[in-house]
Amino acid sequence: MASAGMQILGVVLTLLGWVNGLVSCALPMWKVTAFIGNSIVVAQVVWEGLWMSCVVQSTGQMQCKVYDSLLALPQDLQAARALCVIALLVALFGLLVYLAGAKCTTCVEEKDSKARLVLTSGIVFVISGVLTLIPVCWTAHAIIRDFYNPLVAEAQKRELGASLYLGWAASGLLLLGGGLLCCTCPSGGSQGPSHYMARYSTSAPAISRGPSEYPTKNYV
C-alpha cells in the first residue's frame, strides 16, 4: 500500500511539473523590461518569450507578435525553445511507460516487468526535469549577465520573468516525482524463495502401505 501511495504521489507531482513546463514554454514572459535608472516610469512594458514578444501599453492594451525568424532570436532563447519542447515530449513518453507498468493497468502481467517499467518511467521523468532546468538556468544567467554589464543600454536590460519561475518549479516537480517513482521499485530478489516454497508445497507426501493392505495370497 505504501508503494502504491508513493507511485500515485510521484505521478501527481510529475503531471503538475509537466503542466508548469507547458505553461512556462507557452507564456511570453521569459524576459521582462527592467525598471532601472530613468526608465522607472515608462509608457510600455516589453515581454519576451520563446515564441513571441508582447508590448503592454500603460493603458492596459497588449500587442503580441510571433517571431518571424528563428535565427533572429538570441542564442539562449533558441536553445530554450528546443530543450523545452524535448523535455515536454520526454515527460509524455515517461507517462506512457508508467501507465504500461502501473498496478491498476493490465498491459503487463508480471510484477517484475511492472516494477522495471515504473523504474524506467522515473528515470525518464528525472531526465525531463534536467532538460527543463537547463534552458531556464541558461536564460536566467544571460539576463543577469546583461543586467550587470555596463556596456548594455538600460533600455535593453531585462529582468527575470514569471516563465522562469514556472520553469524552476516544473523542473523541481519532475525531479521529485521521478525520484519517488524510482524509490517505489521493489527488489526482485525477495520473490525468489517464496516462488520455490510454493512449488514444493504443492507436492503431496508419499503414503506407505501397512502390512494388512498387501494381498494375502503372497503369504500362501
Curated annotation (Swiss-Prot):
Query: What tissues is it present in?
Result: Expressed in the liver, in peripheral blood mononuclear cells and hepatocarcinoma cell lines.
Keyword Hydrolase attributed: no
The main location is: other
- Origin organism of this chain? Homo sapiens
Residues found modified as Phosphoserine: 201, 203, 208, 212
Concerning its family, UniProt says: Belongs to the claudin family.
Name of the featured protein: Claudin-6
Under the GO molecular function aspect, what terms does this record hold?
A: identical protein binding; structural molecule activity; virus receptor activity
> What are the coiled-coil residue ranges?
none
Topology of this chain in the membrane: Multi-pass membrane protein
